[in-house]
Amino acid sequence: MAALSFSPSPPPKENPKENPNPGIKTTLKPFGKITVHNVLSESGANALQQHIANQNTIIRKIRDFGMLGAVQSAAASTTNTTPISSQRKRPLGESQKQNRHNQQNQQLSKTSVPAKKCKTNKKLAVERPPKAGTISHPHKSQSDQSFGTPGRKGLPLPQAVARRNARERNRVKQVNNGFALLREKIPEEVSEAFEAQGAGRGASKKLSKVETLRMAVEYIRSLEKLLGFDFPPLNSQGNSSGSGDDSFMFIKDEFDCLDEHFDDSLSNYEMDEQQTVQQTLSEDMLNPPQASDLLPSLTTLNGLQYIRIPGTNTYQLLTTDLLGDLSHEQKLEETAASGQLSRSPVPQKVVRSPCSSPVSPVASTELLLQTQTCATPLQQQVIKQEYVSTNISSSSNAQTSPQQQQQVQNLGSSPILPAFYDQEPVSFYDNVVLPGFKKEFSDILQQDQPNNTTAGCLSDESMIDAIDWWEAHAPKSNGACTNLSV
């Protein structure tokens, strides 16, 4: 086992050659004042302990060579990490080299740390321009940046701080320029009066910002009194003039009144145009359109066209006579220069007629229901056709057979033919149907029978024959009933 003891006496000079047992492998490691001996056998350790009578010697027994290598590596690591330097003697040349190296390190550390300068030296350095021949050393600038705080001792500021300082300087400059401009706008008499009111102030001293603002307020109030503006008080104290939006509106109204006498032609034109627009809008609001005016003047229902009587909500069946009267009236309106003719599309004689069609209301309703499928619904257009003269109609009417007369009586209820009549020859329609229809319809309208209640309508026999013929020729319809009342 190894024994560890400390003694103040210095260690003796040991010589490995004095070992009496040269066959035993031993290693000596100076470790301060303690000497460690590694031996491989117990007998060798006993012999070494007998010959070395030193209390500062440590004997370590190692069983094999592998353990010996591990112990040596551990001892080497402890000697490298320990802060205690070895106390061996060095030659004179080696010690001189070490001293020189230490002095060089101290000089470098002194040059890297900037020395404090007095204020006079700093001012001189700022006033003196830099020499052109000076060359900046990058290693020195890096060392200067590494020490000290930014903004002190001539070091650069961060970018954000520099921008903030520049904005603040710009703001202060703008405020000062604004106050200087305000002082220039105020008359000298007002500024001299304010300077005279200042107690203990020199005449050459500039007015402060607060005094400048007060002077501007008083000057504005004096201008208001001079112009005759009488502003209502904004609070209970009853100030002579107010400020803010109310005072601005009063000033605007007053100046608008002054500018009315100096309007140019363009402004007058714009005002006249606005007045006309306002008058038209007011008239439209005072006279709203009636419900009857909003109704269409011409409508189509189940293939039959109806025209509205002006000023009423009733519709009248459009016939050939009405078409002729309308075309004649349109020609008169085109030729008339004064424009004082009647603009009503319906003649008075048609309005006075007790029946709008030569067929009774019941029969006309049945005919409309039957022609619902074959006629085109909601066809808002007037079909204009050319008709032959009355002489041809009278001659052709004498030649027609009784069956053709029944067809003519049936067709008198509608000026528009159903769809299946398009398949008939054109000559039959032009030469037979239309002339007879026109003659009979004109005769019925011209009859003046005040005692007869069925004036202007067909007889019962002719009506029954017309219905029978219509049922035989018209296709059947399953459409629902429709109301013609408006």
Swiss-Prot record:
A GO cellular component annotation in the UniProt record: nucleus
Tissues where the protein occurs: L(1)SC, SC and AC strongly label the presumptive stomatogastric nervous system, while ASE is more prominent in the presumptive procephalic lobe.
The keyword DNA-binding is annotated on this UniProt entry: yes
Gene designation per UniProt: ase
UniProt keyword list: Developmental protein, Differentiation, DNA-binding, Neurogenesis
Top-level division of the source organism's lineage: Eukaryota
Residue numbers spanned by region Disordered: 1-26, 75-158
InterPro entries: bHLH_dom, HLH_DNA-bd_sf, MASH1/Ascl1a-like
bHLH domain ranges (all copies): 159-223
Subunit structure of this chain's protein: Efficient DNA binding requires dimerization with another bHLH protein.
GO MF entry, a single one: protein heterodimerization activity
Designated name of the protein: Achaete-scute complex protein T8
Keyword DNA-binding among UniProt keywords: yes
UniProt GO BP: central nervous system development; chaeta development; chaeta morphogenesis; epithelial cell proliferation involved in Malpighian tubule morphogenesis; Malpighian tubule tip cell differentiation; negative regulation of mitotic nuclear division; nervous system development; neuroblast fate determination
Compositional bias (Polar residues): 75-86
Job description of the protein: Involved in the determination of the neuronal precursors of optic lobes in the central nervous system.
